[in-house]
Regions:
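Conserved, structured core segments of small domains
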Residues: 21-161
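Boundary at the C-terminal end of the N-terminal hydrophobic targeting segment
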Residues: 17-19
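Sec-dependent signal peptide recognition
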Residues: 2-8
Length: 161
């Protein structure tokens, strides 16, 4: 009885969390990526695909689909990274148009920083299986920070804290 019950739970979770539709679409229409402005400006100027500094370690480019999570993500992973930041807005389809697949999975470390921020484990996050080419980006939003490095808001995406 116990084995049957566990198998049924496993099948149910697999069908719910990893269906093809969920892997491709997620629950939100956009895929966001936080990026240092200097790195994005270089990619755009050279019309080249951007790969984040932790890509070789992580094996993918991190994204966030729920705009309500963006500031938690930024303040957890990047508070000590100085400089101006952007938030890139894309869709699964716009990424696919540049040959890049996106899958929705549980949170994962960024480099050696564990994903133990508030809300990290209550939904799936987009993992971009490649870099981001400027042609995949629908919009670029300015990220506002406090003098101490705290991420405060993303123009046109989030409301100020």
């Amino acid at each position: 009885m116990t084995r049957t019950f566990l198998l049924a739970i496993g099948l149910s979770l697999s069908a719910t969390c990893f269906s093809d539709d969920h892997l491709e679409k997620g629950d939100h229409p956009y895929v966001f990526h936080l990026i240092q402005a200097t790195l994005w400006n270089t990619a755009v100027e050279n019309n080249e695909t951007y790969f984040p500094p932790t890509y070789k370690v992580d094996g993918f480019t991190h994204g966030t689909s729920n705009p309500d999570k963006l500031l938690n993500v930024a303040n957890h992973f990047y508070p000590d990274v100085e400089g101006d930041w952007y938030c890139l807005k894309m869709t699964v389809e716009s990424l696919a148009s540049t040959g890049v697949k996106t899958v929705f999975e549980g949170t994962a470390p960024v480099g050696d920083t564990q994903p133990d921020f508030d809300g990290a484990h209550d939904e799936l996050f987009p993992h971009i299986l490649g870099g981001i080419h400027p042609d995949a980006v629908l919009d670029v939003h300015q990220v506002l920070r406090d003098a101490d490095g705290t991420f405060l808001s993303i123009e046109g995406v989030t409301t100020p804290n």
